[in-house]
């Protein structure tokens, strides 16, 4: 069984009564809004003296979808420079990835630290 209803929408049928001009109640957009790309955030891994290199490579492969070669390069940068950028993402994705890495590291009993920083 289908129910149909007819709705008639009318606006100011009698013309302007208490308004001085005919455009009262009408919204007019002057210009198209400008769209901007969302701010990007770096996901950064920090070196520590206890997390095994194999574990860092695994994290980079699993959470950042890096191949073995690139994951190894990033891991070596973390090891030699103290930190390295794992990827550049919008804020919500960067926060999620950092939280996932930190949770996985804690569950695996490693002190690996992952944080986000605003790009630029």
From Swiss-Prot:
It comes from the Bacteria. One of its GO terms (biological process) is proteolysis. It holds the Pfam family ClpS. Transmembrane segments: none annotated. Binds to the N-terminal domain of the chaperone ClpA. Belongs to the ClpS family. Involved in the modulation of the specificity of the ClpAP-mediated ATP-dependent protein degradation. NCBIfam families: PRK00033.1-2 (NF000669), PRK00033.1-5 (NF000672). This is ATP-dependent Clp protease adapter protein ClpS. The gene is clpS.
